[in-house]
């Protein structure tokens, strides 16, 4: 059931790749609640994924941009404001990738070049996004910026590897930039984690059932992944 909670609101959603993506589910729910969207991912992801299907389904515009490149982000926010007809009310950051995990490098034998890429894509891109938005004055007063994090940012999940470091950094950026943006413009910068069930980096993990159950019991959004993900839109 929709309640028009986002009626008239303009948003940018980073990271929708296919219908298994958390960002995809958030986009669907946001549009159900009345939002207008720009969807973005890297040029390669836009070509290889099915984001165009989501755009057609939701009546959204796709703007390809590399979230690790400041010039791409500047282009993205400028074009998004033109397409949507004004400043942005909400942004979802759902960007994460670890080549160390894909290559099965253990945490005590990381490739530091790949670690740099992990941190840049999964965390520092969030700072770049916020900094560009602030310099361009692209967000409305009291806008909301949300990044997806993971329980491994503060719990040891063997196998989550350098992504745990990236999520810790992501949360630190949210606190530090949120303090500045909140005081100056009332912009709310937050992270939210879902119950740890099959976000893309997590599918390689072999963890105990108890580790999967704990966040469901203890965390504020103690609900299944699909419901949880869609709720973040609100």
Provide a role label for each language-model segment.
Residues 15-25, 96-184, 193-199:
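Catalytic loop of short-chain dehydrogenase/reductase
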Residues 178, 195, 200-202, 206, ...:
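Short, intrinsically disordered, charge-balanced linker/junction segments flanking boundaries
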Residues 124, 187, 191, 206-234:
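C-terminal helical subdomain
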Residues 74, 167, 232:
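Conserved catalytic core of two-component sensor histidine kinases
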């Amino acid at each position: 059931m929709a309640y028009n909670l986002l009626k008239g609101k303009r948003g940018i959603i980073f990271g929708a790749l296919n219908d298994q993506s958390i960002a995809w589910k958030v986009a669907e729910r946001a549009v159900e609640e009345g939002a207008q969207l720009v969807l973005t991912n890297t040029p390669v992801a836009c070509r290889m994924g099915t984001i165009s299907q989501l755009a057609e389904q939701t009546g959204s515009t796709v703007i390809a941009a590399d979230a690790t490149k400041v010039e791409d982000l500047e282009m993205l926010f400028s074009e998004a404001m033109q397409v949507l007809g004004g400043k942005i009310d909400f942004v979802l950051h759902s960007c994460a990738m670890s080549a160390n995990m894909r290559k099965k490098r253990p945490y005590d034998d990381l490739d530091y070049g790949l670690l740099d890429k992990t941190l840049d894509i999964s965390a520092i891109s969030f700072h770049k996004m916020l900094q560009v938005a602030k310099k361009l004055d692209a967000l409305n007063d009291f806008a909301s910026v949300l990044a997806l994090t993971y329980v491994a940012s503060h719990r040891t999940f063997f196998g989550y590897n350098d992504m745990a470091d990236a999520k810790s950094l992501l949360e630190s950026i949210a606190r530090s930039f949120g303090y500045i943006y909140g005081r100056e413009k009332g912009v709310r910068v937050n992270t939210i984690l879902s119950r740890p069930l099959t976000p893309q980096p997590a599918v390689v993990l072999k963890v105990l059932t108890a580790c999967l159950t704990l966040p469901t019991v203890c965390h504020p959004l103690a609900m299944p992944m699909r419901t949880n993900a869609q709720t973040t839109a609100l």
